Amino acid sequence: MIFSTLEHILTHISFSTVSVVITLHLITLLVNEIVGLYNSLEKGMLVTFFCITGLLVTRWVYWKHFPLSDLYESLIFLSWSFYLIHMIPSFLKKEKNSLNVITAPSAIFTQGFATSGLLTEMHQSGILVPALQSQWLMMHVSMMVLGYAALLGGSLLSVTLLIIIFQKDLIQVFDKRKHLLNESFFFGEIQYINEKSNIVQNASPSYVRNYYRSQLIEQLDHWSYRVISLGFIFLTIGILSGAVWANEAWGSYWNWDPKETWAFITWTIFAIYLHIRTNKNLRGANSAIVAFIGFLIIWICYFGVNLLGIGLHSYGSFTLTLN
């Protein structure tokens, strides 16, 4: 009872904190910046991160297994991964970056879906099925979910890049507010180039727009590549550890189970992305399109088996019931 109450409290504190932070930052889009709110997002994200961490630890202690046994727990861990990826660059460089624009809302929406009424039946865990009672559970599933989080974040940066490339007029909308975007822009704030050389200052408005646009595209492409590379490493480790676990549990390293097949397709798509990035002539829009395809494939891989409830990886499947 105590653990259940603590989990309930941590869930609501984390979601309420982030909701307040979002509201405050939305207000700053309509009025001038309010003193004291400049770093409110990072502080709110930090509080939420520790609450989600406490929630996972609580379930781990209470149910006596690593909290990655069903869709609800994996979504909470995915949300935790987004929070982690969000904060690491800020702690390392102490500056804003375009990654924050993606990771913050991703974490919030993932957590919101996990705590919604759709997965209520999964909030109460239970005894693991024999196949999941292995030390490989933590290694395999955590690496896969961390990989999904990084790949999704990097892919969304690529989607943003595509929007900017194919809709040039979009930049003009943001030009009304401190050269393209105010630094307090939604969720973590894209940091546009601070250098203001005399050439740029004396240039025509169209030249300035093109300059900032090219710098933004370069920054998005840079962060997308770094985050996807990290996610690809996690995904590779997850697939390899899963193969070893499958051999122990089912007597075969690879069974072409639906989850395994889609995981392999996901790995192949992002391997193609990384290969394209080695060619300078194909960077930008070409690699971003591949990343966008990978983004769609990840959701098929992550939710597909759970929704269909088929295959050897259908332990955490769920069905939607209508009242």
Swiss-Prot record:
Its main location: plastid. One of its GO terms (biological process) is cytochrome complex assembly. One of its GO terms (molecular function) is heme binding. InterPro entries: Cyt_c_assembly (IPR002541), Cyt_c_biogenesis_CcsA (IPR017562), Cyt_c_biogenesis_CcsA/CcmC (IPR045062). GO terms for cellular component: chloroplast thylakoid membrane; plasma membrane. The chain crosses the membrane at residues 18-38, 43-63, 71-91, 99-119, 146-166, 227-247, 256-276, 288-308. It holds the Pfam family Cytochrom_C_asm. Keywords: Chloroplast, Cytochrome c-type biogenesis, Membrane, Plastid, Thylakoid, Transmembrane, Transmembrane helix. It is a multi-pass membrane protein. Required during biogenesis of c-type cytochromes (cytochrome c6 and cytochrome f) at the step of heme attachment. May interact with Ccs1. This is Cytochrome c biogenesis protein CcsA. It comes from Spinacia oleracea (Spinach). The lineage of its organism: Eukaryota, Viridiplantae, Streptophyta, Embryophyta, Tracheophyta. The gene is ccsA.
